């Protein structure tokens, strides 16, 4: 289904003026951007001679109070629109306005005194701009849903704008021309997607919600209101009639009343207000501030500086003397150094006054300090190394020390090159026969050393390197102690204490030497002999392996 639109009937003066007014209100609604120096005006509007083609693709629902359909629109006509405005060409003005919008509400008159007032850089510099839109090509598919209670809804399935030509007074500048082209294409795309459906929906609600009875009632109320304004006088409202209870809280009113009552006194010592400088104390306050110009003249014996008289006295005395820096190039370094020292001293004086005259806390780190000797002299034994039960510290200096192992010895000893001759003890007279069970190996704790006559390797010797148990006086596998164990006296010589070796040291060299003998001992464990060979070997004087040989048989 399709139909033609008589496009020539739109070229009327009333429709053109109404469209211009509607577009002007729509373009100037809301907050104006800071880049524009004036409002937007419709300079020229022409619908052209060629109208769009409108085609209905589908009608989903059709009734007296509702309608839903899908349509297609195509337009390639000679419609053109010309806009006129003024653009702000001062970038500093634009930056200042944007900063005020982000940080301070510039529409509030109470905030004007805290904002800087620039002179030349803040002046507007407006340039006229004429923007012409022509050669518009539109091709889109939309959905229309109408309801008498919900109004008219228009939604496009795609972006209907195909192309548009933008020409302006800045076409000679290619960068600005490209920028305007891209920006306007984006804005017209948003117009078809969001702005146009919203405007059509709001406009439809305005007319569909009013029936004949409601419209007549509204018209009668408007007429009566206009008549009352002409005949009746307006009532005057005094300040006493204003109820401030809803505008101000009781807490704020109480605080303001206390501040007001504190000043209604003839007392000279008026209580001070926090973070407030009163005008009556302003001169005293300015006297305590450092005067940069006078201090420079006093310290460096410089001539007086001529500063602009329009500046306030406090700012005049404390500003950096530009004329002094320009006229004294030879003494520039000294002047800057003096200014830095004055500012530093002023900062520390202010800091000390806030801290009631106390100096600021500084973190002090002392490097290369001497170690105290009191701790070492008081506890000299603390410097000796402490070792645990399983300590494996090594004493390389004790080369003569050996380690003993508890081993199972064979009843028969093999011929060895390093056998040691031990003296045979005299047999004791027994009252009965002593029988020895030679079938089981004898568990002994013999300790072989390089010198059999030396007593230094005895477990009771103080210089022995044998393994010890934990604690003083603990015998190693039930060895009896022949001498009383006593602790050593406390020595004050630090060198001897530092070089003192513990009894728990193990000589690795001796362990490595004994590993060769341990291989032969393992072979001894594999041999097994009978009782006859055992007694024969024990009676021979050549084999003295046992520490205590069995006594010969006796008859009683």
UniProtKB/Swiss-Prot annotation:
GO terms for biological process: mitochondrial genome maintenance; mitochondrion-endoplasmic reticulum membrane tethering; phospholipid transport. GO terms for cellular component: ERMES complex. This is Mitochondrial distribution and morphology protein 34. Its main location: mitochondrion. It comes from the Eukaryota. The keyword Transport applies. Lacks alpha-helical transmembrane segments, suggesting that it resides in the membrane via beta-sheet conformations similar to those predicted for other outer membrane proteins and porin. The SMP-LTD domain is a barrel-like domain that can bind various types of glycerophospholipids in its interior and mediate their transfer between two adjacent bilayers. CDD domains: SMP_Mdm34. Keywords: Lipid transport, Lipid-binding, Membrane, Mitochondrion, Mitochondrion outer membrane, Transmembrane, Transmembrane beta strand, Transport. Component of the ERMES/MDM complex, which serves as a molecular tether to connect the endoplasmic reticulum (ER) and mitochondria. Components of this complex are involved in the control of mitochondrial shape and protein biogenesis, and function in nonvesicular lipid trafficking between the ER and mitochondria. MDM34 is required for the interaction of the ER-resident membrane protein MMM1 and the outer mitochondrial membrane-resident beta-barrel protein MDM10. Belongs to the MDM34 family. GO terms for molecular function: lipid binding. Residues 1-205 form the SMP-LTD domain. InterPro entries: Mdm34 (IPR027536), SMP_LBD (IPR031468). It is a multi-pass membrane protein. The keyword Transmembrane applies. It comes from Debaryomyces hansenii (strain ATCC 36239 / CBS 767 / BCRC 21394 / JCM 1990 / NBRC 0083 / IGC 2968) (Yeast). Component of the ER-mitochondria encounter structure (ERMES) or MDM complex, composed of MMM1, MDM10, MDM12 and MDM34. It is found in: Mitochondrion outer membrane. Coiled coil: none annotated.
């Amino acid at each position: 289904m399709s139909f033609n639109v008589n496009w020539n009937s739109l070229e009327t003066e009333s429709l053109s003026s109404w469209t211009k007014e509607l577009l002007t209100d729509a373009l100037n609604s809301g907050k104006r951007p800071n880049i524009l120096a004036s409002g937007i005006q419709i300079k020229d509007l022409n619908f052209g001679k060629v109208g769009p083609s409108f085609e209905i693709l589908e009608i989903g629902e059709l009734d007296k109070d509702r309608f839903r359909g899908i349509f297609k629109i195509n337009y390639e006509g000679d419609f053109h629109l010309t806009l006129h405005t003024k653009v702000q060409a001062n970038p500093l003005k634009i930056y200042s306005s944007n900063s005020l919008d982000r940080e301070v509400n510039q529409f509030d008159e109470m905030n004007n005194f805290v904002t800087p007032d620039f002179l030349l850089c803040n002046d507007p510099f407006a340039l006229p701009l004429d923007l012409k839109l022509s050669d518009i090509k539109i091709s889109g598919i939309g959905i229309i849903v109408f309801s008498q209670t919900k109004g008219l809804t228009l939604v496009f399935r795609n972006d209907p704008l195909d192309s548009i030509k933008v020409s302006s007074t800045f076409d000679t500048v290619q960068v600005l021309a490209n920028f305007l082209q891209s920006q306007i294409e984006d804005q017209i795309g948003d117009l078809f997607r969001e702005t146009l459906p919203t405007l059509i929906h709001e406009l439809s609600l305005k007319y569909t919600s009013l029936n004949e009875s409601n419209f007549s009632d509204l018209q009668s109320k408007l007429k009566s209101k206009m008549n009352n304004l002409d005949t009746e006088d307006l009532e005057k409202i005094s300040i006493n009639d204003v109820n401030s209870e809803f505008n101000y809280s009781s807490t704020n009113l109480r605080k303001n009343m206390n501040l007001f009552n504190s000043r209604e006194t003839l007392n000279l010592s008026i209580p001070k207000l926090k973070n407030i400088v009163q005008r009556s104390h302003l001169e005293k306050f300015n006297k305590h501030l450092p005067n940069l110009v006078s201090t420079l003249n006093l310290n460096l014996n410089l001539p007086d500086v001529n500063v602009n008289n329009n500046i306030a006295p406090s700012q005049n005395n404390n500003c950096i003397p530009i004329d002094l820096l320009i006229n004294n190039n030879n003494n520039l370094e000294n002047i800057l150094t003096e200014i830095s020292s004055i500012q530093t001293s002023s900062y520390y004086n202010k800091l000390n006054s806030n801290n009631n005259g106390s100096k600021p806390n500084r973190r002090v780190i002392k490097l290369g300090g001497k170690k105290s000797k009191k701790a070492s002299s008081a506890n000299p034994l603390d410097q000796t190394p402490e070792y645990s039960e399983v300590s494996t510290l090594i004493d390389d200096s004790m080369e003569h020390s050996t380690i003993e192992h508890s081993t199972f010895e064979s009843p028969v000893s093999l011929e060895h090159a390093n056998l040691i001759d031990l003296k045979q003890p005299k047999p004791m007279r027994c009252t009965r026969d002593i029988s020895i069970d030679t079938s089981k190996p004898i568990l002994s704790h013999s300790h072989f050393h390089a010198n059999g006559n030396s007593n230094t390797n005895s477990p009771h010797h103080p210089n022995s390197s044998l393994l010890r148990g934990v604690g003083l006086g603990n015998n190693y596998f039930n060895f009896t102690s022949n001498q009383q164990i006593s602790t050593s006296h406390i020595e004050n010589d630090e060198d001897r204490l530092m070089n003192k070796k513990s009894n728990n040291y193990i000589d690795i060299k001796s362990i490595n030497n004994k590993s060769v003998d341990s291989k032969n001992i393992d072979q001894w464990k594999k041999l097994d002999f009978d009782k006859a060979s055992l007694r024969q070997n024990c009676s021979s004087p050549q084999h003295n392996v046992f520490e205590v040989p069995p006594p010969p048989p006796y008859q009683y």
